[in-house]
């Protein structure tokens, strides 16, 4: 039987990310086109809305990831070096990664799994849901912080720096970045986490190749997406109220818009004023969002084979293995540093 001691949550935040969000919101709303930052959508309540939305029957990315993990987890586990530090960059969906953790345990791989998340309460819930008493070889811990905090922690923590590292990027996370920024982010991961033990360290990520607009739009307008999107405005009000004492946003004034961009090969999610120009509340009261003006908050890029090849190559990485299933547009890729 495993340890009865509860897994530890390490606070690795170099600064409280919440403090930077208001400035990011203001900068995005002053830009052209207007945008909202991703961090605004991942409050504790936002993450809970996201989890409910991503379980909708039409949200194929999650269902396909689980199908593949159930079928291929044993092979994936075999590709992860014994003694690895496994860092899950976004741990909200335990129902996915648990299949890989169980396969690592069955293979008697002595690894330590670190769940990383922005929300302390979500980390606590995730760890409580893991049946740790059923694991002997796999150990559990958690990291409270951002992606960048996690990468810096990996690079600077002497006790684990020289161990093999496996970074998990499930949930099509890399698709949320523009194509150039996705390559930069992967290169950043490699430079922080793979270079100390390049032959044994890797990134395990998912990408989506679906460019069928009807399937994509149906997934990204599934039940639960509207509460998820509007929760960001409530969270923004909470952050700004500390200074202004009034609401910046009225969620009733906005609606959610889902579009497929044929040219860029991506899904685009925006919030749009319902019926009139909107003057925001203090301290953003100098900003007006025009009627029908899109405030984009998220994109999901889809990757065909040539785009994948360019992404990995630009990042200085090579895919050494991949896993998918017939009928699935989602696939898992294991990436390692290109040999010098």
UniProtKB/Swiss-Prot annotation:
Report which reactions are catalysed by this protein.
4-(3-methylbut-2-enyl)-L-tryptophan + S-adenosyl-L-methionine = 4-(3-methylbut-2-enyl)-L-abrine + S-adenosyl-L-homocysteine + H(+)
Q: Does the keyword DNA repair apply?
A: no
> Which Gene Ontology molecular function entries are recorded, alphabetically?
methyltransferase activity
* UniProt keyword annotations, A-Z: Alkaloid metabolism, Methyltransferase, S-adenosyl-L-methionine, Transferase
Q: What is its EC number?
A: 2.1.1.261
Q: Does the keyword Methyltransferase apply?
A: yes
Q: Which Pfam families match?
A: Methyltransf_33
Q: In which pathway does it act?
A: Alkaloid biosynthesis; ergot alkaloid biosynthesis
Q: Name one GO biological process term.
A: methylation
Function description: 4-dimethylallyltryptophan N-methyltransferase; part of the gene cluster that mediates the biosynthesis of fungal ergot alkaloid. DmaW catalyzes the first step of ergot alkaloid biosynthesis by condensing dimethylallyl diphosphate (DMAP) and tryptophan to form 4-dimethylallyl-L-tryptophan. The second step is catalyzed by the methyltransferase easF that methylates 4-dimethylallyl-L-tryptophan in the presence of S-adenosyl-L-methionine, resulting in the formation of 4-dimethylallyl-L-abrine.
Q: Which family does it belong to?
A: Belongs to the methyltransferase superfamily.
Q: How does it assemble?
A: Homodimer.
Could you tell me what this protein is called?
Answer: 4-dimethylallyltryptophan N-methyltransferase easF
Origin species: Trichophyton verrucosum (strain HKI 0517)
């Amino acid at each position: 039987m495993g340890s009865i001691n509860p897994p530890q949550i390490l606070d690795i935040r170099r600064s409280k990310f919440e403090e930077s969000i208001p400035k990011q919101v203001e900068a995005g709303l002053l830009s052209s086109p207007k945008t909202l930052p991703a961090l605004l959508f991942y409050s504790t309540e936002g993450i809970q809305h996201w989890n409910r939305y991503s379980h909708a029957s039409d949200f194929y990315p999650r269902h396909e990831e689980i199908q593949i993990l159930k079928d291929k987890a044993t092979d994936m586990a075999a590709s992860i070096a014994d003694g690895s530090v496994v860092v899950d960059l976004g741990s909200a969906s335990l129902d996915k990664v648990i299949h890989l953790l169980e396969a690592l345990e069955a293979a008697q791989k002595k690894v330590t799994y670190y769940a990383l998340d922005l929300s302390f309460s979500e980390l606590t819930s995730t760890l409580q849901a893991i049946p740790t008493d059923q694991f002997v070889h796999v150990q559990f811990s958690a990291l409270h912080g951002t992606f960048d905090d996690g990468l810096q922690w990996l690079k600077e923590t002497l006790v684990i720096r020289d161990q093999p590292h496996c970074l998990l990027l499930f949930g099509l996370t890399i698709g949320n970045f523009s194509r150039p920024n996705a390559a930069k982010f992967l290169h950043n991961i490699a430079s922080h986490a793979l270079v100390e033990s390049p032959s044994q360290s890797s990134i395990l990520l998912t990408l989506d190749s679906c460019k069928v607009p009807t399937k994509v739009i149906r997934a990204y307008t599934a039940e639960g997406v509207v509460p998820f999107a509007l929760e960001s405005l409530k969270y923004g009000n909470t952050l700004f109220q500390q200074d202004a004492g009034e609401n910046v946003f009225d969620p009733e004034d906005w609606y959610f818009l889902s579009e497929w961009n044929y040219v860029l090969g991506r899904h685009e999610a925006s919030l749009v004023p319902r019926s009139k120009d909107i003057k925001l509340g203090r301290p953003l009261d100098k900003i007006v969002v025009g009627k029908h003006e899109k405030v984009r908050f998220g994109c999901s890029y889809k990757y065909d084979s040539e785009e994948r090849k360019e992404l990995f190559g630009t990042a200085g990485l090579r895919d050494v293995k991949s896993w998918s299933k017939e009928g699935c547009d989602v696939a898992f890729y294991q990436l390692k540093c290109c040999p010098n």
